Every structure is written in structure tokens, then in C-alpha cells.
Curated annotation (Swiss-Prot):
Name of the protein in its database record: Cysteine proteinase EP-B 1
Protein family according to the UniProt entry: Belongs to the peptidase C1 family.
InterPro entries xrefs: Papain-like_cys_pep_sf, Pept_asp_AS, Pept_cys_AS, Pept_his_AS, Peptidase_C1A, Peptidase_C1A_C, Peptidase_C1A_papain-like, Prot_inhib_I29
CDD domains, per database record: Peptidase_C1A
A GO term for molecular function: cysteine-type peptidase activity
Leader sequence residues: 1-28
Species classification: Eukaryota, Viridiplantae, Streptophyta, Embryophyta, Tracheophyta
The gene coding this protein: EPB1
Propeptide residues, chain positions: 29-133
Disulfide bonds: C155-C197, C189-C230, C291-C343
Length: 371
């Protein structure tokens, strides 16, 4: 198992089992033809959906949203009933949101008004690897390099979550210790080139982590789903450890082969177009679209594989909580033939570089003293 301990793997598996159990309890809402046959049946379905997802709407808002809920329910049921795609949809917590609200709240948070920071580590370290020599499947969750699924809430912080997945991963690979890191520090403190809940870019976040000496733990600086004052110095008093990186590299754009080279060695941050209805209500299976390449959401690729029907896929960790998709993950079709990969997954991929094999003690990082 190399540097990653068996204890880490067992702990990750236990956490995953508990998360799956919790998801099944809160979000399993069957939908049949009879649920859509009349207004009364649809109202009953809407009430069951609200109860399952613990959504409370006042009377006027409920009536305003009911039309959207009906449209979404018909879209989901029609897709699943046709059965002409290898993935299914379900009525998740976005059930009574229209596309405009969904985009404004949960996607569209990759900042485009400032350029991404150039890589501080030149080149592409995995370029010499032969694709034919790569393992047929990779899953960094099974190797203990991925923390549990998190939830960004109503904050445009996907860029921070995507960044953290990759940094947590390479740190676990290098040190054998899986440490949950703080997205909130990035939201509050990485303000020169990123903009908290209003969006940001993963490349900029990697450079912030490098230039400021590391990233503190989630336990010391927990997530609040809102931008606040940078309190990293105070949080450091409760955290003797900060995770350091040497910088980042970009995966050559639009190359799924190069993305595979990188993912075979570590989790990788990517951007995708996630604002479509099919992505919004994804439940299970290999996602084959519809989606374009208007990149609006940061996620992380933590593996790849081949489904039973022979379709290759990327394993993607999202930040919409464990009740979305496959316990918080989506399998996106790999090698689809689309330029830049399906949903643009290979267009803007990057990953942190870490050679220092131990988490750094906070007291060793003089750069933080001025925070």
C-alpha cells in the first residue's frame, strides 16, 4: 500500500459507508407515472420532496415554485423512462429551482475577469509516461487520498473546494496522512486574485498556498459558506500543522491522455460546464451529456475506470454534498471524442506539486506571522 496506511483506508471506507447510509435516508424519493398524472399527485410529490430534503417554503413561495418543480419532475421522469442514456436523474435538493437560480447559486463561480496565475513549477512532470503503461483504473478514494464529500452551500466557492481536494490528495500521497484542509481560509484570505463566494480560480489558489507557506486544517479554520475576515493567525493557535506545496502545474489543455497521466499519479483540479439540467439532477451512471464547454464550475478528478458496459469514465468529486449524484460524485464519460473532453473536463486541468514529504509546523512559517 506504499506510504498510505491501512488505518487511513479503513477510516475512509467507514466514513463512506456512513455517508451512503445518511444519503439513502434523506433523498430516496421514488417517482412513478402516477405521481405526474394530476395536479393533486404532483402536489403530493412536492410535499414529499420538501419533507425528504427538509425544505420549508412559505405559502406564496411554494405556489410560485410549484410550476418549476413540475417542469423539473417531468424532465427527470421523461429522461429516466426513455432509458436511452447510461445515466439516471433524480429529484435532488435542487428540485424546485429554475436554471437561473441554480446557476446564480451553485455554478458560475469560476472567476473570468482576471487571468489565472502561471504555473510556478514549469513543464508537465508526467509527459514522459506512456499511456499504454497506465493502470486501467485508478481510484484515489480507495488509496486513502480523498476526504469525505463536502458541501459548498450557497457560496460560489467551488474553486476553493476543487483546490483543496487536490492538495489534500498530494499531501496524503507524499506523507501517508490524510488531512482535511480549510476551504474557508482560501475564501477569507486569498483575496488578491480570487473573490471568496463570488468566484475564483484553482491556479490562483495553488499559488496563494505556495506563496503564503501552506494551508491550515479544516478543524482549525472550519467552513462557514460566507466570506469573512482573514483569521488565519488566530486559527493557527489551534493547529500545529499546515500543509505545504511547491506550486502547481497545468495539464496540457484539451488532452484527455495527459489528464489520465496526471490522474494516475494524483487527484487533479478541473473545470467543467455544470449548469445544464442533466448535470444538475444527475443521480447515477456514466454521464454522457448534455453539456457544453462554457466552464463554470470547479471540481476534482480523483480517478478513472471502465463501466460494465465498456464505457470509460472519469471519477469526479463535486462539492454539493453527499446527497447529490453518486454519494457526491459523478462519473463523466472519458475519451468521448469531444474537443476538450465532455463538459470541457480536459480544458483547464491543474494540480499541486509537492516534494516536501511532511506537513509543516505552523511555527516554522514566518510568512504567516504578519497575517
Amino acid at each position: 500500500m506504499g506510504l498510505l496506511s491501512k488505518k487511513l483506508l479503513v477510516a475512509s471506507m467507514v466514513a463512506a459507508v456512513l455517508a451512503v447510509a445518511a444519503v439513502e435516508l434523506c433523498s430516496a424519493i421514488p417517482m412513478e407515472d402516477k405521481d405526474l398524472e394530476s395536479e393533486e399527485a404532483l402536489w403530493d410529490l412536492y410535499e414529499r420532496w420538501q419533507s425528504a430534503h427538509r425544505v420549508r417554503r412559505h405559502h406564496a413561495e411554494k405556489h410560485r415554485r410549484f410550476g418549476t418543480f413540475k417542469s423539473n419532475a417531468h424532465f427527470i421522469h421523461s429522461h429516466n423512462k426513455r432509458g436511452d442514456h447510461p445515466y439516471r436523474l433524480h429529484l435532488n435538493r435542487f428540485g424546485d429551482m429554475d436554471q437561473a437560480e441554480f446557476r446564480a447559486t451553485f455554478v458560475g463561480d469560476l472567476r473570468r475577469d482576471t487571468p489565472a496565475k502561471p504555473p510556478s513549477v514549469p513543464g508537465f512532470m508526467y509527459a514522459a509516461l506512456n499511456v499504454s503503461d497506465l493502470p486501467p483504473s485508478v481510484d484515489w478514494r480507495q488509496k486513502g487520498a480523498v476526504t469525505g464529500v463536502k458541501d459548498q452551500g450557497k457560496c460560489g466557492s467551488c474553486w476553493a473546494f476543487s483546490t483543496v481536494v487536490s492538495v489534500e490528495g498530494i499531501n496524503a500521497i507524499r506523507t501517508g496522512s490524510l488531512v482535511s484542509l480549510s476551504e474557508q481560509e482560501l475564501i477569507d484570505c486569498d483575496t488578491a486574485d480570487n473573490d471568496g463566494c463570488q468566484g475564483g480560480l484553482m491556479d490562483n489558489a495553488f499559488e496563494y498556498i505556495k506563496n503564503n507557506g501552506g494551508l491550515i486544517t479544516e478543524a482549525a479554520y472550519p467552513y462557514r459558506a460566507a466570506r469573512g475576515t482573514c483569521n488565519v493567525a488566530r486559527a493557527a493557535q489551534n493547529s500545529p500543522v499546515v500543509v505545504h506545496i511547491d506550486g502547481h502545474q497545468d495539464v496540457p489543455a484539451n488532452s484527455e491522455e495527459d489528464l489520465a497521466r496526471a490522474v494516475a499519479n494524483q487527484p487533479v483540479s478541473v473545470a467543467v460546464e455544470a449548469s445544464g439540467k442533466a448535470f444538475m439532477f444527475y443521480s447515477e451512471g456514466v454521464f454522457t451529456g448534455d453539456c457544453g464547454t462554457e466552464l463554470d464550475h470547479g471540481v476534482a478528478v480523483v480517478g478513472y475506470g471502465v463501466a460494465e458496459d465498456g464505457k470509460a469514465y472519469w471519477t469526479v468529486k463535486n462539492s454539493w454534498g453527499p446527497s447529490w449524484g453518486e454519494q457526491g460524485y459523478i462519473r463523466v464519460e472519458k475519451d468521448s471524442g469531444a474537443s476538450g473532453g465532455l463538459c470541457g473536463i480536459a480544458m483547464e486541468a491543474s494540480y499541486p506539486v509537492k516534494t516536501y514529504n511532511k506537513p509543516m509546523p505552523r511555527r516554522a512559517l514566518g510568512a504567516w506571522e504578519s497575517q
